[in-house]
């Protein structure tokens, strides 16, 4: 193989601007045969025209002047396979990882790390960051959105230029940026000094002067910009992961296995938040300044307690950077990619509006080609329908991921921590199981593009029917003093203050629910008029409460205390049924995720796959994940019956919701989004027109068929014919 002399690892030879039309002897070869018109018999004539060329060119490249004029590396610009390693260093032990399974393992580890940081550690640390750096919720909300903003801005450009580039190296860059973003996000802890404890707040009824309104701001809030920078860096790293990484997996495995591999990879990104929540929750039980110790009388139940939120980000930084070297050692294409591509058939959607394709092999290397490529994608009606269906699904999934714990907490009277645990136990395993099942079924039955869309339509239909579980799981509001119940007839409905607590000067900004022995729930011990408490009991108990009517009974329990910390035990028993049905709903919802991704990869031109994923994720965030929590928040706020109002008269968070109205509103938005999803899925099925049978997929355009074959097969045929 004289033509490859001097190239020890073709994967690391830079491609030249000019791509040769022929490559006579290279580790992998691309032959282009122009077809004047599409053959009605499945394209047999173009194959016959290739045979004489193959048989007459087994000679060294020196006999082919056009090819020899180009640099050796340019012969491999389209498809470069090579060993695993760095330049001239290719240890044999690394070659075991030079497989689709080896790449998938590292892809899963990076997706897991990204999920742990972005959707796990960041979310669970937001409330702690608010308190530590004295930020408003609007600022922390912008911190959370910064990741999606970065992803939207970069996704199109990264996916467009990365499609023709070295995708594993792009993922090495992604590992670096994810690690750097996690490191930057933790930096405020090291530069803001030691956390200073404030004075403890007495939650019982005390006669004192009313608190004064203070609108001063703290310099600590300036660390907001550091947190935003960290999120922007994390978004920069996440962009290649879900666009170029997915396309690389699709390149490296047969069509029927692609959905399985993609489903496994996506399931890891879903399991990441679960690990992030568990890890972050455990770290929050450690005091924030672990190196300086803590006061012996400070416990987690104290409102002044802050946990060590920053440790998880340092661990993620180290783990993400440990993946840089493994990704950098992969070749541009895994061994065997040429044969896999040669065996694939095209499923690209065909119609008049998308018939324009590019026969220039250099297309996609210049920024001037970017608008044309995007325009060509936007003309693909099937692609647009599939993307719109995913945006509708993303809207409700992100909305429920954000507010499902709040729904469970209010409907079933649970604590915030336990409600969050139950919500995570339903959402995360259900989503991961759905992704894997969807990929397994599509792979097992070797579904074509249209069948995968039909499969997604069916699963969405089942999820639509199951969405009505919110109506049957609704629970009546428990009696609440000042909201749904009066203070023994002495107070007014809708007013927490009554004659029994008028002298306590209670704060509505301090919500600490209390269950009285009369079965009525109170906003706080102060609003219940409680004067004394016993803190060494679990839960904390209160007595001498002027607003609680003491029942005269002979039971010891009634004389033990008048109220205990926490919400009253709900009389609603629908929680197990709700969790079971909602778990099944989540499975069917996410079963459509992998088939839709596979359909998008199949219905667009082969060279536009990464860009198609970039467009999908950009629109998915602009129309789904960014507005989703906002829309859900507005809808849930519309069901509020008691708002937090501070000393300055500024409305804050909602304390009490109308459970029945909340259930109905969530059903309405779920059904609406599911109907939109089903509509666009069905429209994509109707509009889809597959290419004629036998059309090859390997770097093909509509009027050009590019057959990818290995040089070993070329030489074998030449010897047989000679």
From Swiss-Prot:
Disulfide bonds join 500-530, 506-526, 515-547. It catalyses: estrone 3-sulfate(out) = estrone 3-sulfate(in); L-thyroxine(out) = L-thyroxine(in); 3,3',5-triiodo-L-thyronine(out) = 3,3',5-triiodo-L-thyronine(in); chenodeoxycholate(out) = chenodeoxycholate(in). One of its GO terms (cellular component) is basolateral plasma membrane. Residues 1-81 are annotated as: Disordered. The chain crosses the membrane at residues 102-122, 142-162, 169-193, 219-249, 270-290, 307-331, 377-398, 419-442, 447-470, 579-601, 611-636, 671-688. The modification Phosphothreonine is found at residue 19. Coiled coil: none annotated. Induction: Dramatically down-regulated 1 day after gonadectomy. Residues 25-46 have a biased composition (Polar residues). Keywords: Cell membrane, Developmental protein, Differentiation, Disulfide bond, Ion transport, Membrane, Phosphoprotein, Spermatogenesis, Transmembrane, Transmembrane helix, Transport. One of its GO terms (biological process) is monoatomic ion transport. It is found in: Basolateral cell membrane. Residues 494-549 form the Kazal-like domain. GO terms for molecular function: organic anion transmembrane transporter activity. It comes from the Eukaryota. InterPro entries: Kazal_dom (IPR002350), Kazal_dom_sf (IPR036058), MFS_dom (IPR020846), MFS_trans_sf (IPR036259), OATP (IPR004156). The modification Phosphoserine is found at residues 15-16, 24, 26, 28. Residues 1-101, 163-168, 250-269, 332-376, 443-446, 602-610, 689-722 are cytoplasmic. It holds the Pfam family Kazal_2. It is a multi-pass membrane protein. Mediates the transport of organic anions such as steroids (estrone 3-sulfate, chenodeoxycholate, glycocholate) and thyroid hormones (3,3',5-triiodo-L-thyronine (T3), L-thyroxine (T4)), in the kidney. Capable of transporting cAMP and pharmacological substances such as digoxin, ouabain and methotrexate. Transport is independent of sodium, chloride ion, and ATP. Transport activity is stimulated by an acidic extracellular environment due to increased substrate affinity to the transporter. The driving force for this transport activity is currently not known. PANTHER family: ORGANIC ANION TRANSPORTER, SOLUTE CARRIER ORGANIC ANION TRANSPORTER FAMILY MEMBER 4C1. This is Solute carrier organic anion transporter family member 4C1. It comes from Mus musculus. The gene is Slco4c1.
């Amino acid at each position: 193989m004289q033509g490859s002399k001097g190239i020890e690892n073709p994967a690391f030879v830079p491609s030249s601007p000019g791509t040769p039309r022929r490559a006579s002897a290279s580790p992998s070869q691309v032959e282009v045969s122009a077809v004047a018109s599409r053959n009605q018999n499945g394209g047999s004539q173009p194959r016959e025209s290739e045979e004489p060329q193959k048989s007459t060119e087994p000679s060294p490249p020196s006999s082919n002047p056009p090819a020899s004029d180009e640099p050796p590396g340019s012969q491999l610009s389209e498809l470069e396979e090579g060993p695993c390693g760095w330049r001239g260093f290719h240890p044999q032990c690394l070659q075991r990882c030079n497989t689709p399974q080896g790449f998938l393992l590292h892809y899963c580890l990076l997706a897991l790390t990204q999920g742990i940081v972005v959707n796990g550690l960041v979310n669970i640390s937001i409330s702690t960051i608010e308190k530590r750096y004295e930020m408003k919720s609007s600022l922390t909300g912008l911190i959370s959105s910064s990741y999606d903003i970065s992803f939207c801005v970069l996704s199109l450009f990264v996916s467009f230029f990365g499609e023709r580039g070295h995708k594993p190296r792009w993922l090495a860059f992604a590992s670096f940026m994810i690690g750097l973003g996690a490191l930057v996000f933790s930096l405020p802890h090291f530069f803001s000094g030691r956390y200073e404890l404030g004075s403890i707040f007495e939650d019982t009824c005390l006669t004192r002067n009313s608190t004064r309104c203070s609108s001063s701001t703290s310099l600590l809030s300036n660390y907001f910009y550091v947190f935003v920078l960290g999120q922007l860096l994390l978004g920069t790293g996440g962009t290649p992961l879900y666009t170029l990484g997915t396309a690389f997996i699709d390149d490296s495995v047969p069509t029927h296995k692609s959905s399985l591999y993609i489903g496994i990879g996506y399931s890891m990104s879903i399991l990441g938040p679960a690990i992030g929540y568990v890890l972050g929750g455990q770290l929050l039980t450690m005091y924030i300044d672990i190196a300086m110790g803590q006061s012996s009388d400070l416990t987690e139940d104290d409102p002044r307690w802050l946990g060590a939120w920053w440790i998880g980000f340092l661990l993620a930084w180290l783990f993400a950077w440990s993946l840089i070297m493994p990704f950098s050692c992969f070749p541009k294409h895994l061994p065997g990619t040429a044969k896999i591509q040669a065996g694939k058939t095209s499923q690209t959607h065909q119609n008049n509006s998308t018939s324009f394709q590019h026969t220039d092999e250099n297309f996609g290397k210049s920024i001037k080609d970017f608008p044309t490529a995007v325009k060509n994608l936007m003309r693909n009606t099937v692609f647009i329908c599939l993307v719109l269906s995913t945006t509708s699904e993303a809207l409700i999934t992100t909305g429920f991921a954000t507010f499902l714990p709040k729904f469970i907490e209010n409907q079933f009277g649970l604590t915030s921590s336990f409600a969050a645990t139950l919500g995570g136990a339903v959402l995360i395993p259900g989503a991961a199981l759905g992704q894997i099942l969807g990929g397994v079924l599509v792979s097992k039955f070797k579904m074509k593009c249209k069948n995968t869309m039909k499969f997604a339509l069916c699963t969405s239909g089942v999820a639509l029917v199951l969405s009505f579980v919110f109506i049957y799981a609704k629970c009546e509001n428990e009696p609440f003093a000042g909201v749904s119940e009066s203070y023994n007839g002495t107070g007014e409905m809708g007013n927490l203050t009554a004659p029994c607590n008028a002298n306590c000067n209670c704060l509505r900004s301090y919500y600490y629910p209390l269950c009285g022995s009369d079965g009525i729930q109170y906003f706080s011990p102060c609003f219940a008029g409680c004067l004394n408490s016993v803190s060494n009991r679990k839960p904390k108990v209160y007595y001498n409460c002027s607003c609680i009517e003491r029942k005269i009974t002979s039971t010891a329990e009634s004389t033990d205390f008048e109220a205990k910390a926490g919400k009253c035990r709900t009389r609603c028993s629908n929680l197990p049924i709700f969790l079971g049905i909602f778990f099944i709903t989540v499975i069917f919802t996410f079963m459509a995720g992998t088939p839709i991704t596979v359909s998008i990869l199949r219905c667009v031109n082969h060279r536009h796959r990464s860009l198609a994923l970039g467009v999908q994720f950009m629109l998915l965030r602009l129309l789904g994940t960014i507005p989703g929590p906002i829309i859900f928040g507005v809808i849930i706020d519309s069901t509020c019956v008691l708002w937090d109002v501070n000393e300055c008269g500024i409305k804050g968070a909602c304390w009490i919701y109308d459970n029945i109205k909340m259930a109905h509103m969530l059903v309405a938005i779920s059904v609406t989004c599911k109907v939109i999803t089903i509509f666009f899925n069905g429209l994509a099925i109707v509009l889809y027109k597959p290419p004629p049978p036998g059309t090859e997929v390997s770097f093909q355009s509509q009027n050009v068929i590019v057959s990818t074959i290995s040089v070993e097969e070329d030489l074998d045929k030449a010897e047989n014919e000679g």
